[in-house]
Amino acid sequence: MSNMSQDDVTTGLRTVQQGLEALREEHSTISNTLETSVKGVKEDEAPLPKQKLSQINDNLDKLVCGVDETSLMLMVFQLTQGMDAQHQKYQAQRRRLCQENAWLRDELSSTQIKLQQSEQMVAQLEEENKHLKYMASIKQFDDGTQSDTKTSVDVGPQPVTNETLQELGFGPEDEEDMNASQFNQPTPANQMAASANVGYEIPARLRTLHNLVIQYASQGRYEVAVPLCKQALEDLEKTSGHDHPDVATMLNILALVYRDQNKYKEAANLLNEALSIREKCLGESHPAVAATLNNLAVLFGKRGKFKDAEPLCKRALEIREKVLGDDHPDVAKQLNNLALLCQNQGKYEEVEKYYKRALEIYESKLGPDDPNVAKTKNNLSSAYLKQGKYKEAEELYKQILTRAHEREFGQISGENKPIWQIAEEREENKHKGEGATANEQAGWAKAAKVDSPTVTTTLKNLGALYRRQGKYEAAETLEDVALRAKKQHEPLRSGAMGGIDEMSQSMMASTIGGSRNSMTTSTSQTGLKNKLMNALGFNS
């Protein structure tokens, strides 16, 4: 049966069906004849014909059943044949679609290869153009540094202090910046430069590469910055040996790049290695050692390990005090950083001590109008708030706003009031049923013109403090001024180079000869790296 073809099965079923139909007709005829015979037979002769008739009828029923079953089997077999044919059709379609899919994949792969080749050609042409500009700027930069190496050691404009936790990630005003989840933006170029080379003079050739790496890293172009650093490290170790200050500097830079990529383990290893080299080559009390310790503290702070960061920050403070003196502004910055770390651990007595000492240094050395004075007062106010010392916090907030107002608009008088005083008068007038006066409106407009993140933060914090005291009208006044100030100065800030501050821009300008257009094309990194390394005198 298994060897029979489908046609043989169909033919056999039809033959059986025809044979059963013929037998049914024959038995039906015999049955009718017997019924007629039984009717004409006497009663005593009837049993035999009736018995035959009964057998014929039984056989007829079986034949009818057999015919029906044969018809059903034939129908089922035909359906099975149809399903098999449909299945074969679907299989053929599937094979055809698979072939088409394979062809489309080949076409797509070929098109992608052509697209990549085209993009590489475009990128190569753009890189050639950029390379020529860089070569010109590098030559100009090197010519300038050779004339006076000492005066151009620092990368970009550097203020009195330039490698502290505040500049490397610990925000001076927003306490949330101390949380590890907040450090997602690339480190600004001037901050990375300061943190990497403080207290150590970088050779001109290495400084140029250093500036290029910093520029790429500040733009988030890590795929270019990292290979440049690694190539420079390899060449420096070949020419100068591993235990050399230049190697430590490049390790610092690469660590900061890794840190911005959230590769904290790699960054920590590099910083520890740089620290060991600097301690061995420069001594344990060198400012560059303090800078590396500070970078390690930042790294721990980014991971929320404030307890581990604190001793590193304290050691950096000791070095600065020893080298610079107890009342140097850099010492004040380090005190500010240490206070921020202690604040995140709830050590408020130490926080107050560090902030107050930093405030004394700033006021005595830099004057009451220095921005660091307002920042430190703001930080100290935040510490007071966390301890429930609302009166002390309020007094400091008012001092900040009063000094900012006097600096911008002159001596305080009845016609020239600071915004907090206007806010409190509005609170009093609200209870008396009086509206805002023209002087108050003018005061709001003046306050909104003060473009200072510290002042804006102070307005928000004092407004929150007023709300806690139930002074809702005064709180709304300060919040309104803060919002106006933000809206006024947002268009100005949005025109900056991707959020990089003026110091970063000037540093980049000195590095690339005034060209501020970032390289946004997906480039051939190896070609660019080799050209840059060759231009700088390194073996690629």
From Swiss-Prot:
Would the keyword Cytoplasm turn up in this protein's UniProt record? yes
For this UniProt record, give its keywords in alphabetical order, as a comma-separated list.
Calcium, Cell adhesion, Coiled coil, Cytoplasm, Cytoskeleton, Microtubule, Motor protein, Nucleus, Repeat, TPR repeat, Transport
Name one process (GO BP) from the record.
cell adhesion
Which organism is the protein's source? Caenorhabditis elegans
- UniProt-listed InterPro entries: Kinesin_light, Kinesin_light_repeat, TPR-like_helical_dom_sf, TPR_rpt
**Major place of localization?**
cytoplasm
Question: Which positions are tagged coiled coil?
Answer: 34-138
Instruction: Outline what the protein does.
Output: Kinesin is a microtubule-associated force-producing protein that may play a role in organelle transport. The light chain may function in coupling of cargo to the heavy chain or in the modulation of its ATPase activity. Recruits unc-83 (within the unc-83-unc-84 LINC complex) to the nuclear envelope during nuclear migration to mediate the link between the nuclear envelope and the microtubule cytoskeleton in hypodermal precursor cells.
The residues the entry assigns to the signal sequence are none
Any GO molecular function: kinesin binding
PANTHER family reported in the protein's UniProt record: KINESIN LIGHT CHAIN
Q: Which domain of life is it from?
A: Eukaryota
User: What's the protein name?
Assistant: Kinesin light chain
Q: Please indicate if the UniProt record lists Cell wall biogenesis/degradation as a keyword.
A: no
Q: What happens when the gene is disrupted?
A: RNAi-mediated knockdown results in defects in nuclear migration in hyp7 hypodermal precursor cells. RNAi-mediated knockdown in a dhc-1 (js319) mutant background results in defective nuclei migrations in larval hypodermal P-cells.
Q: Name one GO cellular component term.
A: nuclear envelope
Its localization reads: Cytoplasm, Cytoskeleton; Cytoplasm; Nucleus envelope
Record's subunit section: Oligomeric complex composed of two heavy chains and two light chains. Interacts with unc-83; the interaction is direct. Interacts with unc-33; the interaction regulates unc-33 neurite localization. Interacts with casy-1.
Q: Which family does it belong to?
A: Belongs to the kinesin light chain family.
Q: What is the lineage of its organism?
A: Eukaryota, Metazoa, Ecdysozoa, Nematoda, Chromadorea
Q: Which Pfam families match?
A: TPR_10, TPR_12
